[in-house]
Amino acid sequence: PRARELGLKGLVASYQGSVITDIESGKLLVDGYLPADEAAEICKVFERLDLHTHVYTLNEFYVNRRDEALSLYEKICNVKGNVVEEEPLSGLVLRKALKIRKVLAMVYAEDKKRIFENVLKALGEKFYVTYSAANLVEVTSRAYSKGTAVKFMADYYGVPIERTIAAGDSLNDLPMLQAAGLGLAVKNADEALKDKAQSFPFTNDEDAIGKI
């Protein structure tokens, strides 16, 4: 809806590439949701680690605690979470048989590496585990990533993959940079991404995309 409000047309990818939507019609072209039992499995790991957790359906999200971090997230993203405190999110997901597109943990930046590694160890063989910011650890379907989204869009528009360009700033962008003909890590990118991708000498605040 927000892309439509801006007058944009074409396709938009979300939830780490597991959902691709036609902006004008709202039609889902790709919908790689997690079945309720798999989403609950992820939630139980997050619950064991006592993490601030969000679970996302297609158009809303549920969260296990109301705190300052959630208020800031809601303000920045202009969204409103459904706070669930009467039962674990794993129980809610199973009870409602929710189709979950993403499970996310909000963490302190200084704890991100440790928590990411713990989640990766527990879930990495079965699910796609990544992080998208200094304080966000995310888990989605292993079958999808921003890389699969780039390949889908290139095929959809009839553009050879070697003629595509992608730019990113965090680890969740790596599959996209690897899939594209030219993949660039902007100047302010996470060091883990810079180590694995070609660097570009401008930050996002310096209009890096416009200068490619």
Predicted regions and their residues:
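Short, intrinsically disordered, charge-balanced linker/junction segments flanking boundaries
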Residues: 1, 89-90, 210-212
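Short amphipathic alpha-helical segments
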Residues: 2-4, 25, 67, 116-118, ...
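Short, hinge-like loop/turn segments at secondary-structure boundaries
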Residues: 4-10, 29-32, 69-74, 146-148, ...
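Short, structured coil segments at secondary-structure junctions
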Residues: 6-8, 16, 24, 123-125, ...
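Short secondary-structure capping/turn micro-motifs that flank functional sites
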Residues: 19, 62-63, 170, 193
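Mg2+-dependent phosphoryl-transfer enzymes with acidic/Ser/Thr/Gly-rich catalytic loops
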Residues: 138-212
